[in-house]
Structures are given as structure tokens and as C-alpha cells.
């Protein structure tokens, strides 16, 4: 069942009840986003105050399977969704996570955060391609706190990214599976970066473009301080 349908099926719980569990005694460290115009339950993707969805995907650079909730109870986690031939928002989305990784290394909190970019173009985005793409954006993809997740095939990508995380994407007529960079957009897609806390709840869902790096770092710092 799609995430949106699951949320609607649980509508009896009510948005008001959900909001009532937030705040100082709730599952989040941050307050409701100032720019939040829609109720989280009306959004297809996980939003403020909601639990992180669960899916298990290969992490080819580390040669193991990783569950999206693997670090719940241990680390705050950042997710984003991309394809490496993207010439628009995807490089910035990845660079944001790389900047967090660098800041964590420099300030000594690498073991408090996990970075999980997820590709939805598994045919083209092989282990080597993912590694080179991450390194070009300033990341250390071999580090333990960087898990570049790659679905096994297109169907699994749709299941996890499109359905479990509620982020739509679609191949364009320019798509080729293995002919390199066509310098055109192979996918139409929305952008999303999720900041989830150590307890597995969404603190921020940055949608509609790449968030400013300083905003992400400031939000992460506030979350870290809250859970110290």
C-alpha cells in the first residue's frame, strides 16, 4: 500500500492528536517549521513529527545490506534521493550531506550522525559511479557514517523511493540505461532531504529544492544539543 493511503487509513488518530504529542515533551527537538503550510498527514512523504519509514537496501560501497532505521537509537540521520546524471538539484543535495560529514569529522561527532543518500537509478548508478559521484561532491563514501543505498532494480527503487518514502520520480524520453551522461534530464523528480533524530522521528523535511547548507547544519546542531 502506498504511504499516502496508509496515512489516510490512520486518519482516525487525527492530526490534532499527532500535534498534541509534539513540542517539549514530544518526539522532536525542533519546533514546527515556520513554512509548514500542510498537515504532515496530507503529504505523501514523511514530514515533521512522523516516524522514519523502514526499508532494507544494498549499500554497495560497504558491501552489505542497510536498513533505513538501522541507526535509530544510535545516531541522527540525513537522507536524500537522487540520480547521479542529474544536472540540477542532485549534486547540491549530495554536497549538503558531504558538508555535514565534513563538519562532523572536524568537530568530532562523526559517530553521532549517519548520511544515507538513495539512488533511484540503480541500473546506471553502479558502485563505482556512486563512489565517484560522492567523492566529487566532497564526501568520503568509504566512511562508516556514509551509506550510499542502491535498490536492486528499477522495481525496488519505485517500491522504496516512490511508495515507502512517497517521493515521485519518472524516467524521461532522454533516459538511457548505460550510455553515459546524455547531458539531458533522464528523470523528472521532486527533491527531498530528511533530517531524522536518534529516536527515528522526522525533524525536518526539506522539500522543493536543496536547503541551504547552514540551515541543515544549524538544525542538526539544535537536534544534537537537545538529545545530549
Segments (PLM) and residue ranges:
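Hydrophobic alpha-helical segments
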Residues: 1-228
Amino acid at each position: 500500500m502506498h504511504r499516502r493511503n496508509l496515512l489516510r487509513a490512520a486518519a482516525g488518530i487525527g492530526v490534532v492528536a499527532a500535534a498534541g504529542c509534539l513540542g517539549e515533551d514530544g518526539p522532536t527537538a525542533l519546533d514546527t517549521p515556520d513554512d509548514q503550510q500542510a498537515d504532515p498527514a496530507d503529504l505523501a512523504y514523511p514530514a515533521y513529527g512522523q516516524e522514519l519509514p523502514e526499508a532494507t537496501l544494498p549499500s554497495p560501497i560497504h558491501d552489505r545490506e542497510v536498513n533505513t532505521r538501522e541507526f535509530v537509537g544510535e545516531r541522527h540521520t540525513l537522507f536524500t534521493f537522487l540520480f547521479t546524471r542529474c544536472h540540477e538539484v542532485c549534486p547540491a543535495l549530495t554536497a549538503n550531506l558531504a558538508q555535514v560529514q565534513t563538519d562532523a569529522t572536524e568537530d568530532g561527532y562523526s559517530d553521532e550522525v549517519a548520511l544515507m543518500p538513495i539512488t533511484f537509478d540503480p541500473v546506471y548508478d553502479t558502485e563505482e559511479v556512486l563512489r565517484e559521484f560522492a567523492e566529487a561532491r566532497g564526501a568520503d563514501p568509504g566512511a562508516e557514517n556514509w551509506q550510499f543505498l542502491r535498490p536492486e532494480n528499477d522495481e525496488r527503487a519505485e517500491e522504496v523511493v516512490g511508495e515507502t518514502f512517497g517521493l515521485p520520480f519518472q524516467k524521461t524520453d532522454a533516459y538511457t540505461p548505460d550510455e553515459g551522461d546524455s547531458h539531458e534530464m533522464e528523470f523528472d523528480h521532486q527533491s527531498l532531504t530528511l533530517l531524522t533524530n536518534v529516536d527515528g522521528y522526522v525533524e525536518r523535511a526539506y522539500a522543493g529544492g536543496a536547503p541551504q547548507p547552514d540551515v541543515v547544519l544549524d538544525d542538526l546542531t539544535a537536534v544534537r544539543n537537545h538529545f545530549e
